[in-house]
Design a protein with these regions (language model features):
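Canonical P-loop GTPase G-domain recognition
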Residues: 96-146, 306-311, 316-369
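NTP-binding/hydrolysis catalytic cores, primarily Walker-type P-loop NTPases
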Residues: 359-408
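N-terminal accessory targeting/assembly segments
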Residues: 1-107
Length: 408
């Protein structure tokens, strides 16, 4: 993070008269903190509609000018995605750095991207966002020499003209296609292995990485900061003596997730779409738990990841003062967990095993010694519980997938 912190004022428009704007601004403050900024003020304007030219009304702009002066603010962050016109007009009126929620999230993603795929995805999203706002950014191009909103591979390319940006976007898309083909190949290999895949999904900072680490000792970065991990990780998890499942951690969801990011991170987010089981990790200690769960299910719907078996983990029970037996009506299983204490993790593994068993057939058979190939098929695609050599052949007890049962 930068040594000299950006001093920002958060700005939102309340169009429905509820407390949603306040909650959203609280989250924006957490995002700003994650990006390394210091929040020195906040402002909410009740309006029927967002002002098409300046986001907020002229009276509020005057108030904002005074607040910037009083707090020695260096920039503002608006809670909605600004158009190039709004950005340009606000900059002309306020003479400071203008950012919006989308640019802030892009900045955080740029700081957290580790893998080659992650860096490509972030740069692509940054360039697409900025290409449509070159005119609106105006003098901000020269302001973006430091502070939030400037990180990542995209920062050196801000002053490209549109043609060069289009060329760069085209190259990045081709690179991403290669990465996506590799990801599809990996998915195909997983399918061939016969192992089921469970995707950990959830609102950012719900504790997905903590759950994965507690179960598999994966060593994935854990952090209370938002979007601490961007890159997906897949680890094998042993459910009982012989049955394994692949556990995949995915990028966290958030309210108003920028469409540029959804598009750029499509191959990563689609891990949930291609998984056999969805594991919805919820921060049970967060007062906005219900609203966050709604965002997760809405995002899954947009990704086409519906109609799957769902296990909801009401996580961070160690932080809940008055534990409640929550039940997610959209899930097949609801389990109270704590990655820190281990609460509920064995119950979670049992639920995973139960889902797998529903799609398997239990067999007890005596195979001739010449049928070793069938036993090898069971070993590679199913769960071989035991094999005992007797004078008549090989006695086998196993769980096998329905699709290979006829070949045994």
């Amino acid at each position: 993070m930068d040594e000299i912190k950006e001093r920002v004022i958060l700005v939102a428009v309340d169009t429905d008269g509820s407390d949603q704007a306040e909650r959203s601004l609280d989250e924006l403050g957490e995002l700003a903190k994650t990006a390394g900024a210091e929040v020195v003020g906040r402002m909410i304007q009740p309006r029927e509609n967002i002002h098409p030219g300046t986001y907020i009304g002229k009276g509020k702009i005057l108030e904002l000018k005074e607040l910037l002066w009083e707090t020695h603010g260096t920039g503002i962050i608006c809670d909605d995605e600004l158009t190039s016109v709004q950005m340009g007009n606000l900059e002309a009126e306020l003479d400071c750095k203008i950012m919006d929620r989308t640019l802030l999230i892009l900045d955080i993603f740029a700081a957290r991207a580790v893998s080659g795929e992650g860096k490509i995805q972030v740069e692509l999203a940054q360039l697409k966002y900025r290409a449509s706002r070159l005119a609106g950014l105006g003098k901000s191009l020269s302001r973006l020499g430091g502070g939030i909103g400037t990180r990542g591979p995209g920062e050196k390319k801000l002053e490209m003209d549109r043609r060069l940006i289009r060329e760069r976007i085209s190259r990045l898309k081709k690179e991403l296609k290669d990465v996506e083909r590799h990801r599809e190949l990996i998915r195909g290999q997983r399918k061939q292995s016969g192992l089921k895949v469970a995707a950990l999904v959830g609102y950012t900072s719900a504790g997905k990485s903590s759950i994965e680490n507690a179960l598999t000792q994966a060593g994935v970065l854990e952090d209370e900061m938002l979007f601490s991990t961007l890159d997906t990780t897949t680890r094998a998890l042993t459910l009982d003596n012989t049955q394994e499942i692949l556990l995949t951690d995915t990028v966290g969801f958030i309210n108003k997730l920028p469409h540029h990011l959804v598009e750029a991170f499509k191959s990563t987010l689609e891990e949930a779409k291609y998984a056999d089981i969805i594991v919805h990790v919820v921060d049970a200690s967060n007062p906005q738990m219900d609203a966050q769960m709604h965002v997760v299910y809405e995002t899954l719907r947009q990704l086409g990841a519906e109609g799957k078996q769902v296990i909801t983990l009401f996580n961070k029970q160690d932080k809940v003062e008055n534990p409640v037996n929550h039940k997610d009506l959209q899930a097949d299983y609801s389990i109270a967990t704590s990655a820190k204490t281990g609460q509920g993790l064995e119950e979670f593994k049992h639920a995973l095993l139960e889902i797998i068993r529903k799609e398997q057939i239990y067999i007890e058979r005596l195979y001739d010694f010449s049928e070793a190939g069938k036993i090898q098929l069971i070993r590679s695609k199913g769960q071989l519980l035991s094999e005992e050599y007797v004078p008549e052949g090989i006695e086998v007890k196993a769980y096998v997938p329905q699709d290979i049962y006829g070949r045994l």
